[in-house]
Amino acid sequence: MFDQDDAAFSRPGGEACGAAPARPIDLAHLARQTMDDRDLEREVLSLFVQQALSVRDKILDADATQRRALAHGLKGAARGVGAMAIAEWAERAEEHPQDLRLLRRLAGLIRQVRDFIAAIDR
C-alpha cells in the first residue's frame, strides 16, 4: 500500500509550491457560451479585446458618471467571455469610480487578457 507522502502523490516542487495561476479567460465558460464553436470564440474574443481596450483608453479621462457606464459595460462583456477578474475589478470601478488605483489595476488586467488572447490565437 502506498503512503500519501510517496513521490507519486506529492506536488511537483513540494508542498510549498502554490496553485497554478488562473487563466485570465475561463475557456470552459467561453466554450459553453459559444457552443464549442472555435470560430465564434475567436470572433467574440476579438470583439471583447476591442471593447476592453477602448474602455481602458477612455476611462481615466472620463467623469465619474462616464466611468460607471464604461465599467458597467465592461463588466457584462467580461462575464460573457469568462474574463472574471476583469468583471470583478470593473464592478469595483463601477462602485468607486474615483479610485485611480482600481482603474490602474483594471488596465493591467486588460493588458493581461489581451496578451493571453493573442497567445492562444497563434
Regions found by a protein language model. Give the residues of each.
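Amphipathic, coiled-coil-like alpha-helical segments
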Residues: M1-A28, D39, E43-S54, A77-W89, ...
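Conserved catalytic core of two-component sensor histidine kinases, primarily the HATPase_c ATP-binding
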Residues: A31
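Helix-loop segments that flank and shape redox-cofactor active sites
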Residues: S54-R68
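Signal-transduction coiled-coil helices of two-component systems
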Residues: I59-A62, V81, A93
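An anion-binding catalytic pocket shared by soluble metabolic enzymes
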Residues: L74
